[in-house]
């Protein structure tokens, strides 16, 4: 039954491993439940309503993918697209949040249509094999960089762009987490990343990093979504500018999702010899449905999360991993004060170790052929330097086409 519903094979998979993987995936991406409401609230949206919408949309999309695609790739609101929503569409271009949310709803509907017509699948399967491996490694570098930046280990510098940050309780806790995660992994402790997060959260209490508020109660009643539910506004919708906005949202989501799916599929070993990803259409459809329903609730665009790699690193291989993750998103509605105690610094070790795990795919890139190695390198480094998986992919693909054409290998450009 579990094999048919979730792809869980008891003969080759362990239920305990899948459960730990699901918990680990949730813990490493649960920050979105705190960050997404904070970002969208800058537009005037009700923070409590957005929190509820974020948790429900994440649970819905993740559970859909669990049962439809049977893969351990969790989904939640995109950090790139929620920033685009708040800081570009609303604060930059002057649209109301209702109009901007309408654009995301329409984008989600278009997503469903082009996924049904296999357009996104064609895009995914047209990516050259060496670039797929480079995307996986690049995402690993990106994840590690995000963890180091959020912990203050890497900070901005006007002269060199980035530099090693000062020693603070947050950065020290993050460094401890990196070492602890590495040691636990080397000792082959099952659930190493999960235990690292829990231990660092406890260590953070005396350091003042894990903050326990006065009158703390671990359980709360979910906030109503009434202030954001289906609050659409089509008054400013039928314009050329809005058409460009929708196209941009579509483009960003396609490449974010495609890049992440390729990287995670490479890491799990499910990618077939010809580079095809099993159940990719179902994975993309759950993304599209999640985006559409999420925008109706009051959440920004849904995408596949690179943090799923943390659960994969713990051994998650089936939809059962996502069943656990999805249920935890639902429980988070009632235990929001409890899981919000986990500081981002406590997850840094997991993110860095995941980056290490994903880097092994670079060994599969043909580095002796510069026409393959250069686009692969551009893909990886630009993901980090532009702070965007999508930008890294686009630049890598562009480099691939131009280099192949330039050296007379036009037949290799599909």
Kindly give the residue locations of the regions a language model identified.
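Helix-loop-helix hairpins and the membrane-proximal interhelical loops
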Residues: 1-49, 162-163, 195-281
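Membrane-helix interface/capping residues of multi-pass secondary transporters
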Residues: 47-48, 73, 97, 389
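Residue-level signature of catalytic and energy-coupling elements of molecular machines
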Residues: 19, 39, 123, 191, ...
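Membrane-embedded alpha-helical modules
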Residues: 93-206, 210, 323-414
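Transmembrane alpha-helix interface/packing and boundary motifs in multi-pass membrane proteins
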Residues: 61-74, 183-188, 249-256, 287-297, ...
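Helix-loop-helix junctions within the multi-pass membrane cores of secondary transporters/permeases
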Residues: 2-36, 57-58, 78-87, 91-136, ...
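Loop-to-helix transition at the N-terminal end of transmembrane alpha-helices
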Residues: 44-63
